[in-house]
Amino acid sequence: MWRRIVSSHLKSISAVGSCAAPSCRHAVVESTHLSLSTRASSIPAYSSIFSRLIGSAAADTAVKKRVEDVMPIATGHEKEELQAELEGRKLDDIDFPEGPFGTKEAPAVVKSYYDMRIVGCPGGEGEDEHDVVWFWLEKGKSFECPVCTQYFKLEVVGPGGPPDGHGDDHH
């Protein structure tokens, strides 16, 4: 429930930061607070504290927001998602890669948080489709699908390192 409340109002909070005129900021804050308070009757009492926190925080400053300002109890992946939304990024963009058929000169780029990722190749479109072929895609190496000859390349957009969190040098 918290995620729904936060994600639906992150855009209005970020709009406060992008609005330069004080009157514009006041209007956005008022509309944010109004939309939060109209939902308060359908949300348990503890979330009204949360809505007041968002409304008052947005009214006080139009500076960069931190996740702790919006949702202090967020941790782990949820905190990363909220931080990315506050910065205007979408972490889900790396989950469903789409694009043109990868060639040797221009491989299909797959984004990953780590130096390795499991990828599935469904082939091209129409008659070029095939059963999904699963493989490990590694940083710095391209991979050619053995069925459709599509090429893939990994782009690391996160902290890097192995996906299990353990380095090879700890043995």
Swiss-Prot record:
InterPro entries associated with the record: Cyt_c_oxidase_su5b (IPR002124), Cyt_c_oxidase_su5b_sf (IPR036972)
Binding site for Zn(2+): 121, 145, 148
GO MF: metal ion binding
Pfam families referenced in this protein's UniProt entry, alphabetically: COX5B
Transit peptide range per the UniProt entry: 1-54
One GO CC term, this protein: respiratory chain complex IV
Keywords: Membrane, Metal-binding, Mitochondrion, Mitochondrion inner membrane, Transit peptide, Zinc
Record's subcellular location: Mitochondrion inner membrane
GO BP annotation list: mitochondrial electron transport, cytochrome c to oxygen
Main location class: mitochondrion
SUPFAM superfamilies xref list: Rubredoxin-like (SSF57802)
Similarity remark: Belongs to the cytochrome c oxidase subunit 5B (TC 3.D.4.11) family.
Function as written in the Swiss-Prot or TrEMBL entry: This protein is one of the nuclear-coded polypeptide chains of cytochrome c oxidase, the terminal oxidase in mitochondrial electron transport.
Protein name: Cytochrome c oxidase subunit 5b-2, mitochondrial
The species this protein was found in: Arabidopsis thaliana
